[in-house]
């Protein structure tokens, strides 16, 4: 049988949406001149209200089909290697998988609601392959259930991209720190590839490997990053803390409130808080609903900003800043015990808001 079906795993790219790699299914039928790729990762930034729908977690992806030649040329052009795992399927299973993919490619079926952790370009091919098999796919025991969290895997693939890691860490909450099963780890294409490598197709009478061969079919060396040095989130937050601390000491010595600094700092914190609150309350994205960073960045920082500025300008004690000081102090003290992993750059940012809140108490008490 000359028909061959394979799982393709593509190396990560430089864009944030490609940092985790990509998965597709290749279908080869030389007798009919067919060599195509089924790709569940198609989306368009030009979709109406794309940014708003994305923030709501209502991004629609779709299954696309392209010639393998064009698929390979694109990944080679962008310096992304591709691995091919030829599937060890019977003729009946091959026919079933082809029919499932063709049915899924019908216009009324090809669009699906994307979910970063649970329904993406890696989980869809896995599910279709499993559905086509007359038996059960038994995956290897490593990595064990509970040995990873979603955040662990995010950090693994954001290595070398500190701002992407920082941004994702801001948005995902404590749910991302819960241990996950091996199957859940397969949202990441290379975890899926490793699982397929050791998987067996088990029936009542025999078992066979899921994968016949695994080969590197596009071998390219990525271009070196020539973007130059860029400060990390931690370096930026530490610099902001030092500058804010120096300005605050100056203001306390002069017994004056620096309302312009408070306007910028609490305004920025409030804007970030509005984004986090929106994600927590309205978004369908996974793992964003229980975010303890809302103790630091929340809409109240923006809502009470006019009152904060008024009190600081008039040299009056601000009850909101007093409450803010208490909450931020508790956050810093209890930081190690909070059931959520934070990027450490958050600590200097929290301290910035804390010392600005404390400065109001100190300055107003000195004026009495």
Predicted segments, located by residue:
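Glycine-rich catalytic cores of cysteine/serine-nucleophile enzymes that process amide/ester linkages
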Residues: 3-79
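Extracellular structured ligand-interaction cores
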Residues: 22, 35, 84-86, 122, ...
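Catalytic-site beta-strand/loop segments enriched in glycine and acidic/polar residues
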Residues: 2-8, 101-107
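Activation targets extended, charge/polar-rich intrinsically disordered C-terminal tails
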Residues: 103-306, 310-317, 326-368
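A structural motif
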Residues: 89-102
């Amino acid at each position: 049988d000359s028909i061959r079906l394979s799982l393709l795993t593509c190396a990560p790219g430089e864009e944030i949406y490609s940092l985790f790699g990509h998965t597709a299914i290749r279908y080869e039928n030389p007798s009919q001149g067919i060599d195509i790729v089924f790709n569940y990762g198609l989306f368009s930034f030009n979709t109406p209200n794309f940014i708003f729908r994305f923030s709501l977690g209502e991004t629609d992806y779709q299954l696309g089909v392209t010639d393998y030649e064009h698929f390979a040329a694109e990944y080679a052009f962008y310096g992304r290697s591709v691995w091919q795992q030829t599937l060890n399927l019977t003729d009946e299973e091959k026919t079933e998988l082809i029919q499932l993919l063709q049915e899924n490619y019908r216009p009324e079926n090809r669009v699906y609601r994307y979910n970063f952790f649970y329904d993406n370009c890696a989980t869809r091919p896995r599910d279709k392959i499993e559905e086509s098999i007359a038996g059960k796919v038994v995956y290897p025991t490593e990595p064990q259930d509970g040995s990873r969290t979603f955040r662990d895997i995010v950090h693994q693939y954001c290595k070398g991209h500190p701002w992407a890691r920082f941004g994702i860490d801001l948005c995902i909450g404590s749910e991302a720190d819960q241990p996950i099963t091996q199957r859940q780890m397969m949202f990441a294409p290379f975890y899926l590839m490793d699982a397929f490598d050791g998987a067996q197709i088990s029936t009542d009478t025999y078992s066979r490997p899921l994968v016949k061969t695994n080969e590197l079919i596009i071998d390219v060396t990525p271009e070196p990053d020539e973007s130059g040095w860029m400060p990390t989130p931690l370096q930026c937050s530490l610099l902001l803390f030092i500058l804010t601390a120096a300005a605050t000491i100056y203001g306390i010595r002069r017994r004056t409130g620096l309302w312009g600094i408070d306007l910028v700092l609490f305004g920025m914190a409030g804007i970030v808080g509005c984004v986090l609150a929106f994600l927590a309350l309205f978004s369908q994205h996974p793992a964003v609903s229980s975010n303890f960073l809302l103790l630091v960045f929340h809409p109240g920082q923006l809502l009470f900003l006019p009152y904060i500025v008024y009190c600081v300008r008039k040299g009056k004690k601000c009850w909101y800043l007093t409450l803010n000081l208490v909450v931020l102090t508790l956050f810093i003290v209890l930081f190690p015990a909070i059931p959520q992993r934070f990027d450490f750059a958050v600590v200097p940012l929290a301290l910035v808001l804390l010392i600005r809140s404390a400065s109001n108490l100190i300055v107003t008490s000195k004026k009495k």
